[in-house]
Amino acid sequence: RRREPPFQFWSRIKGLAMSHLMNTYARLPVAFSHGDGSWVTDTDGKIYLDALSGIAVSTLGHNHPELVAAIAAQAGRLLHTSNLYRMPQQEQLADKLTALAGMDEVFFCNSGCEANEAAIKLARFYGHQHGVDSPAIIVMEKAFHGRTMATLSATGNRKTQAGFEPLVSGFVRVPYNDLD
């Protein structure tokens, strides 16, 4: 028996129109229209504390005037180019980050998933460069790493992985706080 997707269930319960978005998350029955700082407002005007600060790539909260102005100013000059070209602002930021972190280089990503995917590749590359034929990467049980094939394979949730087998091998799962 096929289970009804969660959004269809809530649409039926709340009388919401079905969305044309692919149902990849079990969405909650709330729609946000705007935010300010750590607060978000839904389409009914109810205000919530956003304890996640916008989650993932928006960790600075919502609608900060200086950030909005900086984004608008940059969008008015140049929004994005390929990494095939040099970008002075990107290089200036890389200089600052490497100085602060005491590192030699940085790798800018569009998402946490892309960052995790790059970390997996770098770890495997390092292993191969040091004579390890099948490098293994330690990941935490029940952790979420992303939805690409490699990051999904690293994710410690069988429910999230179901239906996408065969998964990428080379991950060793350990429980949190187990230092042995």
Where are these regions (language model features)?
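Short secondary-structure boundary/capping elements
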Residues: 32, 63, 89, 174-177
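Glycine-rich loop-to-alpha-helix module at the N-terminal edge of alpha/beta enzyme cores
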Residues: 19, 47-132
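Active-site-adjacent loop/helix segments that line or gate small-molecule/cofactor pockets in enzymes
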Residues: 13-36, 53, 84
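PLP-dependent aspartate aminotransferase-fold enzymes
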Residues: 95-180
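Short, acidic, Ser/Thr-enriched surface-loop or helix-capping motifs
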Residues: 42-43
